[in-house]
């Protein structure tokens, strides 16, 4: 049941963000793609034996997230870390390109910034305090790259 509650809480945060983005940036192409592509009905928990920790399929046809600190363990991650991960995944939906391109990184940073403004995410500098997520370590947060220009 905890997993369902975590996914629901993450979805509510995304919906809050989407409302803000729609009001502030209704004609921005990346926002339009995100508004069109995000669908809470396709949000799923990744099973522990999966090769993935999080992914979005076909720009929003499926969105899956691992909810544990470690694979094959029952301890769940905190909502702020899950929010960071889902914001990463919806940044793929907002991008035309596939993968971790310059466009994606710029969209991710934009989405993180807007999530902080919407008070749905508290930014953490993972370079100073890395966190465990589904057997991996998150060590970077583009939110703190304010003055950095991304290159391909």
Q: Where do the protein language model's features map onto the residues?
A:
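Active-site recognition of the HExxH zinc-binding catalytic motif
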Residues: 81-96
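Metalloprotease/metallohydrolase-associated module, dominated by Zn2+-dependent proteases
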Residues: 2-77, 97-152
């Amino acid at each position: 049941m905890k997993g369902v509650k975590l996914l629901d809480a993450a979805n509510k945060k995304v919906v809050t963000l989407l409302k803000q983005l729609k009001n502030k940036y209704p004609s921005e192409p990346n926002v339009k793609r995100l508004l069109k592509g995000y669908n809470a009905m396709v949000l799923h928990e990744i099973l522990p034996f999966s090769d993935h920790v999080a992914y979005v399929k076909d720009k929003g046809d499926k969105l899956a997230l691992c909810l544990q600190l470690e694979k094959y363990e029952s301890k769940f991650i905190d909502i702020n870390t899950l929010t960071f991960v889902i914001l990463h995944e919806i940044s793929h939906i907002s991008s035309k390109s596939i993968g971790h391109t310059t466009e994606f990184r710029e969209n991710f940073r934009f989405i993180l910034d807007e999530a902080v403004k919407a008070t749905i995410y508290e930014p953490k500098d993972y370079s100073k305090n890395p966190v465990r997520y589904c057997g991996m370590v998150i060590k970077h947060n583009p939110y703190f790259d304010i003055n950095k220009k991304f290159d391909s």
